[in-house]
């Protein structure tokens, strides 16, 4: 299902000058396909498409050739002798940002299409914290997690606290950027001895240290996949191969358990990212990030 946003409504998705760290803070923990467009801080005139996908935040550079177009571009024709600007992302070229966003409504970047812009209400919610304001804990015991909302960790791991919704359960983030709920009795408060420890957690997903807010753009950019369209169930059955094991909550009878390598018949594609399907004679819902769609033109090549 295509994204539910108006690509011509600039104010909903364009954030102007925003650092990578600020973009991560806005998008981390959002559902797959939530995105924003910002100015590149290292390449003036270019843009960056930042997207929440596969439990991380990916950043795709959008290179602009020729005069930088307005956002969205004016319908006026360029002066004689001036070539119109072109926008390139990966191997794709577009005349405007709205055209680019429309394309990725129905084509995958890596593991998701564009679903909706991040809400601007998060800008004033205190979600962006400077490192000195962050709170950390150290694990006293191993914790394997009991359900999908939990964040597993090992004894000695350093975690960054993001929120405290309950007295005994806090929301935390590990050094890989994964987030989830942790049991408070399993951890102790921890104060980093140096900035290098705090920089390790809560930074960008490419492994380089986060920069000060509004600072340079660290780390490499992701590359979009080549022309992978969102499948259309009206064209016939769609199959996918499980790439990540899933053990659903025992109390959720509508969730589908998955084992790596199993074949899933997709029966419904929801914009939320929770798809529905059949596997081993059982029907239920599952996160689409746990499967890889097979080549619908030659599915038999993947069935073996």
UniProtKB/Swiss-Prot annotation:
GO terms for cellular component: actin cytoskeleton; cytoplasm; cytosol; membrane; neuromuscular junction; plasma membrane; protein-containing complex. Phosphorylated on Tyr-221 upon cell adhesion. Results in the negative regulation of the association with SH2- and SH3-binding partners, possibly by the formation of an intramolecular interaction of phosphorylated Tyr-221 with the SH2 domain. This leads finally to the down-regulation of the Crk signaling pathway. Isoform Crk-II: Phosphorylated by KIT. Proline isomerization at Pro-237 by PPIA acts as a switch between two conformations: an autoinhibitory conformation in the cis form, where the tandem SH3 domains interact intramolecularly, and an activated conformation in the trans form. The modification Phosphotyrosine is found at residues 108, 221, 239. It comes from the Eukaryota. Gene3D superfamilies: SH2 domain, SH3 Domains. One of its GO terms (molecular function) is ubiquitin protein ligase binding. Residues 13-118 form the SH2 domain. Changing residue 221 to F: No activation of Rac signaling. One of its GO terms (biological process) is lipid metabolic process. It is found in: Cytoplasm; Cell membrane. The record marks 237 as: Proline switch. Residues 132-192, 235-296 form the SH3 domain. The C-terminal SH3 domain function as a negative modulator for transformation and the N-terminal SH3 domain appears to function as a positive regulator for transformation. The SH2 domain mediates interaction with tyrosine phosphorylated proteins. Mediates interaction with SHB. PANTHER family: ADAPTER MOLECULE CRK, SH2-SH3 ADAPTOR PROTEIN-RELATED. This is Adapter molecule crk. It comes from Rattus norvegicus.
